[in-house]
Amino acid sequence: MSLLTEVETYVLSIVPSGPLKAEIAQRLEDVFAGKNTDLEALMEWLKTRPILSPLTKGILGFVFTLTVPSERGLQRRRFVQNALNGNGDPNNMDRAVKLYRKLKREITFHGAKEVALSYSTGALASCMGLIYNRMGTVTTEVAFGLVCATCEQIADSQHRSHRQMVTTTNPLIRHENRMVLASTTAKAMEQVAGSSEQAAEAMEVASQARQMVQAMRTIGTHPSSSAGLKDDLLENLQAYQKRMGVQMQRFK
């Protein structure tokens, strides 16, 4: 796996699924391929994106700044600086300085990532802030190692909380989660179906599912009534795809 592929993988792992994620993936691909060279416009676009947490925006801004060639005097962006200040905690800043000194001795992406993984997310963000504010310099490879270590930590904590939700025994949470998944699967079906004539059936199934979820939410139902809703939808989607000769496992 190439370095940039690895960076893209880690960065996208912390972006919530949805149309915005696809947009960000495209922007990253363009930047890494040298197709997007307007850093100013890129940062302005990033700043106004909804849904993303300030830290995610800060990390993306840091990656864009590392990758897109820019004039030396280009102004640093406040939204990135604020996100990478380690919540203003002086302990984070102290640890970030220690980490920075260690990173200065590293020359490889993997070496930097290994060193960085033993620090807290706050310290890692502060260290990125140091480099972003030009208070310290490391090679691009080492900076990417720092980025990926930070993303790995964030993705780990997201995964833990996701697992807790999936394994929760609270029937109300499980019920709502099934309905949300059914709703997003229906939305995805509508997108995949596109505008072909054969797509009418898939659109109909998706539309019915969304109406059912809406009705269940409006009148309130027994928590077990949503069991199998998403699976039924996926079965319908896969049957439709087989007929269309399309194979899309990614909704699983």
From Swiss-Prot:
Q: Tell me where on the tree of life, at the top rank, the source sits.
A: Viruses
**Keyword set, alphabetical order:** Host nucleus, Membrane, RNA-binding, Viral matrix protein, Virion
Region spans: Membrane-binding:
1-164
The protein's topology relative to the membrane is: Peripheral membrane protein
Q: SUPFAM superfamilies annotated for this entry?
A: Influenza virus matrix protein M1
Q: Which GO terms describe its cellular component?
A: host cell nucleus; membrane; virion membrane
What role does it play? Plays critical roles in virus replication, from virus entry and uncoating to assembly and budding of the virus particle. M1 binding to ribonucleocapsids (RNPs) in nucleus seems to inhibit viral transcription. Interaction of viral NEP with M1-RNP is thought to promote nuclear export of the complex, which is targeted to the virion assembly site at the apical plasma membrane in polarized epithelial cells. Interactions with NA and HA may bring M1, a non-raft-associated protein, into lipid rafts. Forms a continuous shell on the inner side of the lipid bilayer in virion, where it binds the RNP. Determines the virion's shape: spherical or filamentous. Clinical isolates of influenza are characterized by the presence of significant proportion of filamentous virions, whereas after multiple passage on eggs or cell culture, virions have only spherical morphology. Filamentous virions are thought to be important to infect neighboring cells, and spherical virions more suited to spread through aerosol between hosts organisms.
Subunit-structure text = Homodimer and homomultimer. Interacts with NEP. Binds ribonucleocapsid by both interacting with genomic RNA and NP protein. May interact with HA and NA. Cannot bind NP without genomic RNA.
Identification of the protein by name: Matrix protein 1
